[in-house]
């Protein structure tokens, strides 16, 4: 069975070992337009796609062996679901794969804004911390704290719950 992996620069190296070890043929190629997708997928039984997949009706119509498209990401809005259904192609995704990372990033941004990390980092890089502390001290009194405050979370989906 041939599996096509649309490369995006940093595919995990173990994928080839994993698939080939199970009797699959994994073919990896970077694709930037529909023609390249068709060339890669035309003989494939399955496709692993990640960033900005061009899984349009035209692409799928040219891939008569294609049985499944697995989207390495949360959404499937980049896949023509109507065409896939019409052509009998199963569409999969990886819900929740980035929930923790997005929640952690939101917390990091909150801390960065509250503690003025960017501004203070710039001052330190200019050497103000060591020899011109009077330029840094005004920021110290303006630094916010999260402790004792209420943080509002808009939306309690997977990411909002993880953030909480």
Name each region found by the language model.
Residues 29-30, 72-73, 88-100:
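Short beta->alpha connector loops at strand-helix junctions that form conserved
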Residues 87, 95-150:
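Phosphate-binding beta-alpha-beta segment of Rossmann-like dinucleotide-binding domains, i.e.
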Residues 40-42, 60-63, 146:
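A short, aliphatic-rich alpha-helical micro-motif
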Residues 159:
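Hydrophobic/small residue at the entry helix of a nucleotide-binding pocket
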Residues 5, 151-153:
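Hydrophobic Val/Ile/Leu positions in short beta-strands of Rossmann-like dinucleotide-binding domains
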Residues 77-89:
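Rossmann-fold NAD(P)-binding glycine/threonine-rich loop
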Residues 1-44:
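N-terminal glycine-/charge-rich "phosphate-binding" loop or analogous flexible N-terminal tail
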């Amino acid at each position: 069975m041939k599996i096509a992996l649309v490369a995006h620069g940093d595919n995990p190296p173990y994928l080839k070992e994993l698939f080939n070890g199970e009797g699959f043929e994994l073919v990896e190629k970077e694709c930037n337009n529909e023609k390249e997708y068709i060339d890669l997928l035309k003989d494939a039984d399955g496709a692993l796609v990640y960033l900005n997949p061009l899984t349009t009706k035209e692409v799928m119509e040219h891939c008569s062996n294609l049985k499944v498209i697995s989207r390495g990401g949360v959404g499937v809005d980049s896949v023509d679901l109507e065409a896939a259904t019409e052509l009998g192609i199963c569409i999969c995704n990886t819900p929740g794969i980035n929930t923790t990372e997005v929640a952690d990033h939101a917390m990091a941004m909150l801390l960065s804004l509250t503690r003025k990390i960017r501004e203070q980092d710039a001052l330190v890089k200019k050497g103000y911390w060591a020899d011109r502390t009077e330029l840094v001290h005004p920021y110290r009194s303006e630094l916010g704290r999260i402790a004792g405050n209420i943080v509002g979370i808009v939306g309690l989906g997977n990411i909002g719950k993880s953030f909480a």
